[in-house]
């Protein structure tokens, strides 16, 4: 799971890849915002709208904690009395199939109160409109594993820059393939 304290605090006027990630998360959360990498007035007002806080649009750890699920592509839901897979999927704007696929040990007609479910959001997890960093790759891999629990992931070590060298393992059998990008 991703550690929030690694996140960059963002201020109005900043530019760059983390501003793109902020804008991507806001867009995925349903806000109408362009992804241009510039923390201008539009981004500021959208952050205020998303957080419900006016008078300051600094993006701190508290704000990132709200946004990270939209970068990973899923959230979690603690089952309460009266919940059903249908009601949970509807609450988060996703499908029953996606919730069941992410939680293979859950019986749709027998939800236990207190069970923590993974709830994938209904959008493509791999973005094609932002620059990539090791941060984004880790979020994508985490999100893929949450959506597809049969997908195994791990780290082969670290790059010279200190980033994890991640791998994905899918399926079983005698044939193996390795792809490095």
Model-derived segments and spans:
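Conserved hydrophobic/aromatic packing and binding residues within compact polymer-binding modules
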Residues: 47-50, 99
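Short, solvent-exposed linear patches
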Residues: 17, 42-47, 83-87
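Ser/Thr-centric signal marking residues that sit
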Residues: 43-46, 63, 94-95, 159
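Short capping motifs at secondary-structure boundaries
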Residues: 27-30, 50-56
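Acidic, Ser/Thr/Pro/Gly-enriched interdomain connector segments
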Residues: 1-37, 77-80
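M14 metallocarboxypeptidase catalytic domain recognition
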Residues: 71-82, 86-181
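Short, basic amphipathic alpha-helical segments that act as recognition/interaction helices
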Residues: 64-70
């Amino acid at each position: 799971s991703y550690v929030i304290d690694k996140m960059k605090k963002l201020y109005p006027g900043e530019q760059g890849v983390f501003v793109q990630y902020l804008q991507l998360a806001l867009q995925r959360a349903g806000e109408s915002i362009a992804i241009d990498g510039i923390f201008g007035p539009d981004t500021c007002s959208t952050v205020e709208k998303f957080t419900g806080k006016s008078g300051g649009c600094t993006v701190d750890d508290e704000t990132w904690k709200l946004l990270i699920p939209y970068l990973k592509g899923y959230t979690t839901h603690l089952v309460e009395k009266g919940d059903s897979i249908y009601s949970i999927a509807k609450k988060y704007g996703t499908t029953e199939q996606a919730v069941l696929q992410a939680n293979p040990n859950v019986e749709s007609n027998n939800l236990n109160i207190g069970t923590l479910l993974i709830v994938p959001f209904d959008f493509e997890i791999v973005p094609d409109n932002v620059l990539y960093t090791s941060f984004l790759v880790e979020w994508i891999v985490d999100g893929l594993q949450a959506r597809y629990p049969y997908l195994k992931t791990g780290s082969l070590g670290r790059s010279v820059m200190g980033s994890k060298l991640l791998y994905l393992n899918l399926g079983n059998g005698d044939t193996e393939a390795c792809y490095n990008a």
